[in-house]
Amino acid sequence: MFVNLVLVAAMFRRVSGVVHTQELQPRFREIIVERGSFGGSEKVALITMRGLISSNLPGTVGDSMVDDLRSALQQARDDNRVKAVVLEIDSPGGEVTASDEIYNAVVKTRKRKPVVIYMDTLAASGGYYVSCGGKFLMANETTITGSIGVIIQTLNYEKLFDKVGLASVVFKSGKFKDMLNGARPMTPEERDYMQGFVMKIYDKFLGIVAKERNLPADNLRNTIADGRILSGKEALEHRLIDGVGELEDAFAKAKQLGGAPSATVVKYGPPFSLSRFFRAFGEAGDSKIKLELPKQFVPQLESGHVYLLPSFYAP
């Protein structure tokens, strides 16, 4: 009996160690999307980026969706059998810093192996920012893209406060410390400061587009880089992308650029974990009825935060 208990304890420690290691170094499982030649080991990795780009949205294996994408791109970089990557994007954009982090991860991957960007229904603003990191950009003719611009918004509720008899009391260390306070109007000096701040971020966005697409920044500034959205067909005409087609065409292009015409296309999905497995059973037993939109469809914008988003997405 004592020997059995010792064996069980040893097995438990071994399993716990494996699970702990997987949690420290999350790896994505591979789901075959398009099978290549029999016996071949070469692969094209399909990675998806969907919904609002935000470090506040939880990931499936990491702390956030940004962590997930960076981990997936790293896995593709480190796998010698992966000859190219297809990054499928369906996103309106999102936080500036989160978009920049993913863009840099795409560029880092591109330096090791070809990255083909496929823009699905929507790849606008921050979604296009991320796309610029790819070697070859492809979209559907009806894809909504472009929206090269930056937005910060806040609410002014001064009149509402007056109506209900509320007043905002602020103690501040400097004149700009509460410049987005909605309980009072902005001063001209505050407005100029915020506009200048927005334009600095816009110039960085514009510079990335100009560099990656080999287009004159001034020409972009005076034409299409004014926040307007473009169809995939229009984006091709303005050289914001390299081609139009379907997802299968992106696979073919990735195989061509990676020199692996017979490669198998694999999609990265979340790995199996005991915690997710048991959580699924717990949720199945929850009898509460919930009417909720998926988080990626609910605007998660916070007042005063800087976003790369089309104007129609901002509430």
Task: Name what the model sees in each region.
Residues 129-136:
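Alpha-helix C-terminal capping segments
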Residues 142-150:
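Active-site loop architecture of trypsin-fold serine endopeptidases
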Residues 1-117, 121-124, 136-140, 152-315:
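N-terminal organellar transit peptides
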